[in-house]
A protein has these predicted regions:
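Hydrophobic, helix-rich cores of sensory/ligand-binding and other regulatory modules
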Residues: 1-95
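Amphipathic alpha-helical repeat elements characteristic of tetratricopeptide repeat
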Residues: 16-23, 106-110, 157-161
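Conserved phosphate/pyrophosphate-binding and hydrolysis machinery centered on Walker-type P-loop NTPases
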Residues: 34, 79, 102-106, 125, ...
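The cytosolic transmitter module of two-component sensor histidine kinases
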Residues: 37, 82, 105-109, 176
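Basic, amphipathic alpha-helical hairpins
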Residues: 71-74, 90-101, 111-124, 142-147, ...
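Basic/polar phosphate-binding segments, predominantly the helix-turn-helix DNA-binding elements
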Residues: 92, 126-158, 180-206
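Short, Lys/Arg-enriched anionic-surface-contact patches
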Residues: 96-108, 149-159
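Terminal helix-turn-helix DNA-binding modules in bacterial transcription factors
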Residues: 113-118, 145-186, 208-212
Length: 212
């Protein structure tokens, strides 16, 4: 099967980042035997995998390598915590692969994702489209057609992962006003609503699960 031949460094960089995220998450889960936390982690990691895979940031071979790496580094008993993750990921890889002739504007999409990763605190669709010298509606259409997500989906997902890093490194629940501002949200209420809509739990509930 053909693989997307994009920027090798960019592809490897994100595959490594994803591997690191899963490693940290698994290590955390194995210390805390809480089923609900495992479900939350599965959801977030799968969401991240889908975003990166659909964006062709890493291809099928790298995704398969990721699953092999998980099995090499964790026992079957440990992987039981994330059994559904592995199954769902395999299914997703098999069912969502699209031929390259349907993949258009890869450079444009890759650039947009890179900008979101690097400037998530202040980036907006208008500024990004201006930098690319294209119409915002055209950029939105390209992202939707190729990644099956919106600009805001990508931006909110990135910000949520940054918020999770805050939670994992905080001994007490961060004040939402400060966290929201640091992430680039206009208010704590807006951040709260976005987090709850994407994760299914409130920031407070997630922090308590991660710190239990």
């Amino acid at each position: 099967m053909d693989h997307y031949q994009g920027d090798p460094f960019f592809s490897q960089q994100y595959a490594a980042l994803l591997q690191e995220q899963i490693s940290k998450g698994l290590d955390l889960l194995l210390k805390k035997d809480i089923p609900s936390k495992s479900m939350l982690f599965r959801y977030l990691i799968l969401l991240y995998i889908k975003k990166q895979y659909r964006a062709r940031i890493f291809h099928l071979g790298q995704a398969a390598h990721l699953l092999i790496w998980m099995n090499d580094h964790y026992t079957k008993a440990q992987l039981h915590h994330c059994e559904k993750l592995v199954q769902d990921t395999c299914h997703m890889i098999e069912s969502t692969h699209e031929s390259l002739d349907r993949w258009k504007n890869p450079a444009l999409c890759s650039y947009a994702i890179r900008q979101i990763e690097q400037h998530y605190q202040k980036i907006c669709l208008h500024d990004l489209s201006s930098a690319l010298k294209i119409n915002p509606s055209y950029l939105s259409r390209v992202l939707s057609q190729n990644l099956h997500v919106t600009f805001l989906d990508l931006l909110h997902t990135k910000r949520i992962f940054v918020a999770l890093e805050y939670f994992s490194n905080s001994k007490k629940l961060p004040q939402l006003e400060y966290l929201a501002t640091d992430l680039g949200y206009s208010s704590a209420h807006y951040f709260y609503c976005v987090f709850k809509r994407y994760v299914g739990l409130t920031p407070s509930e997630v922090w308590h699960l991660m710190s239990a």
